[in-house]
Amino acid sequence: MTDYRTQPINQKNADFVEQVADRIEEMQLEGRSLWQDAKRRFFRNKAAVASLIILAFIIIFITVAPWFFPFTYEDTDWNMMSAAPTMEGYHFFGTDASGRDLLVRTAIGGRISLLVGIAGAFISVTIGTIYGAISGYVGGKTDMLMMRFLEILSSFPFMFFVILLVTLFGQNIFLIFIAIGAIAWLGLARIVRGQTLSLKNKEFVEAAIVCGVPRRQIILKHIIPNVLGLVAVYASLEVPGLILFESFLSFLGLGTQEPMSSWGALLSDGAAQMEVSPWLLIFPAFFLCLTLFCFNFIGDGLRDALDPKDR
């Protein structure tokens, strides 16, 4: 026999469960909408999208271009030394004083420069984010000691550090990674620390503390995910600075070693022969400047897309 008194209650329970499910779905959608909104705003930025497309073509060029030519970055064409750009011999960007093809060397140099920029940014972002989050969340004497250590590193003469590494270990591309990674994370660590100081007083962090969640999990699962937007913007703006810095080191002769090259080293060689062989300076400078502009516009687009004031 059916108990009709239970039908309204069961119906209410069903309605309540349905409402809860709808609310959970809405909350999930709201959680995703932050990044979806940022994505939509980014792709509405024409300069950022155009820069992203151009940068993709540059990456494709430096990746596949050397495969389509019958010589490497160190091969010498004795019959085409200091040759201007020509279709003859497939030297579309010309050759240098040693008869080496500039197009292939520009592509290989682009690989080195982009690798230094992206790898250096990854190292600095990883160290800076973790260091800043720990310092800001733990606080107290630990925070004070970590910030004093940061100030000591910031006051250290960076060029002296690079020259010391080169003197002790010789010119090596890995030394550039070490040198850049040793100093580039300092600024981000301060920024992440400031964000962490404001985040650790939020309700969701306090709730995690009340539930007995360990500090490490709070930092990794609650603090760091909430600063990823800031970190992404910082990384996109850090890459061009690191590329430019590597080019500066190579221009001074402290970067890549012959016959390997980078855009900075090519600029140094081109500047020395600018009057007689201007193409040696024009092509590397064009790719370097174009890449720097692309990264800057992409960084500006990310910053605008993730800016909560504009939502």
Curated annotation (Swiss-Prot):
Family statement drawn from the similarity comment of this UniProt entry: Belongs to the binding-protein-dependent transport system permease family. OppBC subfamily.
Protein name: Oligopeptide transport system permease protein OppC
Pfam families membership: BPD_transp_1, OppC_N
Organism, as annotated: Haemophilus influenzae (strain ATCC 51907 / DSM 11121 / KW20 / Rd)
Membrane topology recorded in Swiss-Prot or TrEMBL: Multi-pass membrane protein
CDD domains, per the entry: TM_PBP2
Taxonomy, superkingdom: Bacteria
Keywords, alphabetical: Cell inner membrane, Cell membrane, Membrane, Peptide transport, Protein transport, Transmembrane, Transmembrane helix, Transport
Main location as per UniProt: membrane
Assembly with partners or alone: The complex is composed of two ATP-binding proteins (OppD and OppF), two transmembrane proteins (OppB and OppC) and a solute-binding protein (OppA).
Signal peptide positions (record): none
Subcellular location: Cell inner membrane
